[in-house]
């Protein structure tokens, strides 16, 4: 039985303004997720996802296609109207504006996403993909320690995730996963939540997912978790997006 793809729509004002987000979206596994991005500004596309232009101030802000998940980026009124009026099981608004009013038609509102979803330009250009989450002290990378230390000198501790049989939401972070923790970081709860993105969206159960290599943090010698089996596509979609939200900003979404 062939499993249906997750259908994801992203609404933006323009592709240049949300480059970091789109770089992540562009790396989603196209075998699992079908991505449509709608922009209010004209563009020259270099991305592999479907990219569409939509004009402002249409009489009806309506996309005649249904999605599992709809995401609106920013506070642009036309972007928000398009997202609200598109049929979807889950609607999410990502906003960096603290004064934004509440939108009851969105299932979740995530704030200050630009500080928490990041692709390092320097490493990206050298084909060394890195994702930095939660604060400047935590880095997730598929690079080996020696290569990353060439770019970031003050990393002290290495946390290794075992290789998975399946790909996680960010499919470009493949094979061996590493988390590098700079000295002085005490927010271990948030750090551990980074692991859960890759550990909880799978349909099969896993145990002993995380092995931790460190001397100072010997209290965290082992961290075990099992992914819950997902019985239907709808709950599978929500599980993916919930973990996506946790990775971006666990504290600030509503």
Predicted feature locations:
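N-terminal pre-catalytic "stem/leader" segment of glycosyltransferase-like enzymes
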Residues: 1-67
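Catalytic core of nucleotide-activated saccharide and alditol-phosphate transferases
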Residues: 64, 79-135
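Short His-centered aromatic/hydrophobic patch
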Residues: 73-77
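Conserved catalytic-core segment of nucleotide-activated headgroup transferases in glycan assembly
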Residues: 21, 131-166
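Conserved acidic donor-binding loop of glycosyltransferase catalytic domains
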Residues: 182, 202-205, 212
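A charged, aromatic-enriched C-terminal amphipathic alpha-helix characteristic of glycosyltransferases
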Residues: 218-254
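Acidic donor-binding loop of glycosyltransferase active sites
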Residues: 171-186, 197-200
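Short hydrophobic faces within alpha-helices
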Residues: 193-194
């Amino acid at each position: 039985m062939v499993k249906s793809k997750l259908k994801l729509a992203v609404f933006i004002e323009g592709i240049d303004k949300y480059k970091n987000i789109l770089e992540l979206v562009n790396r989603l596994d196209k075998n699992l997720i079908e991505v449509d991005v709608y922009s209010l500004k004209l563009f020259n596309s270099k991305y592999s996802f479907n990219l569409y232009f939509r004009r402002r101030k249409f009489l009806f802000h309506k996309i005649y296609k249904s999605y599992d998940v709809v995401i609106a980026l920013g506070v642009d009124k036309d972007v928000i109207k398009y997202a609200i009026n598109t049929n979807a099981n889950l609607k999410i608004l990502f906003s960096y504006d603290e004064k934004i009013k509440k939108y009851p038609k969105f299932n979740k509102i995530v704030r200050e996403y630009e500080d928490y979803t990041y692709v390092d330009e320097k490493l990206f250009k050298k084909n060394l993909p890195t994702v930095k989450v939660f604060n400047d002290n935590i880095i997730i990378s598929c690079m080996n320690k020696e290569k990353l230390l060439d770019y970031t000198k003050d990393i002290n501790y290495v946390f290794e995730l075992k290789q998975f049989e399946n790909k996680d939401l960010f499919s470009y972070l493949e094979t061996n996963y590493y988390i590098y923790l700079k000295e002085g970081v005490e927010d271990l709860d948030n750090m551990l939540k980074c692991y859960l993105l890759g550990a909880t969206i799978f349909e099969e159960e896993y145990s002993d997912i995380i092995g931790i290599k460190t001397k100072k943090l010997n209290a965290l010698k082992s961290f075990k978790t099992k992914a819950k089996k997902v019985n239907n596509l709808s709950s599978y979609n929500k599980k993916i997006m919930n973990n996506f939200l946790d990775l971006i900003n666990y504290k600030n979404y509503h």
